[in-house]
């Protein structure tokens, strides 16, 4: 599952740029501190309902902003750990730091 972490990614795709400008995306990306997190940990970090965080995580994975760092089985349930694909995402008009 290991993916290469990049220092910086420049986003030129309009759709990805729009996603990066959303407040929830900024909060999700800012909650990482050098360690991958589960969906529950992300939700707790940003005080967001766990049931709703999955939609946003799925969207960020589909747009190569987050990736699944690892998977493990905990009490019979597959638990995934997520991590940003870069430390800094740059759009033509702003930078978003993780």
Residue spans of the language-model regions?
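Long, low-complexity, charged/polar intrinsically disordered regions in eukaryotic proteins
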Residues: 1-14
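Short, cationic-aromatic polyanion-contact patches
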Residues: 11-24, 38, 70-93
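Pre-recognition alpha-helix immediately N-terminal to the DNA-recognition helix
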Residues: 26-30
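Short capping segments at the starts of secondary-structure elements
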Residues: 34-41
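A short acidic, leucine-rich amphipathic alpha-helix
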Residues: 41-47, 60
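Short coil turns linking two alpha-helices in DNA-binding domains
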Residues: 49-51
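Glycine-centered, phosphate/nucleic-acid-interacting loop/turn motifs that mediate DNA/RNA or nucleotide
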Residues: 64
């Amino acid at each position: 599952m290991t993916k290469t972490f990049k220092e910086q990614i420049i986003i030129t795709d309009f759709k990805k740029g729009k996603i990066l400008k959303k407040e929830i995306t900024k909060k999700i990306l800012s909650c990482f501190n050098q360690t991958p997190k589960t969906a529950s940990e992300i939700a707790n970090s940003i005080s967001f309902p766990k049931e709703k965080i999955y939609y946003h995580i799925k969207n960020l994975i589909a747009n190569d902003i987050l990736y699944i760092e690892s998977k493990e089985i905990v009490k019979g349930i597959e638990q995934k750990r997520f991590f940003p694909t870069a430390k800094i995402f740059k759009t033509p008009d702003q930078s978003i730091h993780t």
